Amino acid sequence: DGALRLWTWTRDGLLPVAGHWSSLDAQSLALPDGVYTTLRTYGGTRVVGLGSHLQRLVESRRLLGADCNLDVAWLRAGLKAAIAAAALPEARLRITVPLSCAQAWIGAEPFVPYTAWL
């Protein structure tokens, strides 16, 4: 439908978060402090450099003194679930992970290509 969407990913699964935001940036301001990465999908489900995105989250949390290790396989599963739920041909996604390990937030919006002059 083209709407900006937000989910919380916990050990219980992917749950939609109600709200209205103008952008992923505005959405991020409503979330707890943590680390984030922004990426895009290609062909609906492919993400280039996903391992690097996830490693940056792990490293950023470590540098900030997070008291638990980020389960990358768990986070990958959440991203896969959010991509499927978004059902967009191409999407821009933001994964936000607080310093606690209880949950993550995944926001999605339709990807809009940059103009040719860029």
Can you say where each PLM-predicted feature lies in the sequence?
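Conserved alpha/beta cores of soluble small-molecule-handling proteins
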Residues: 1-118
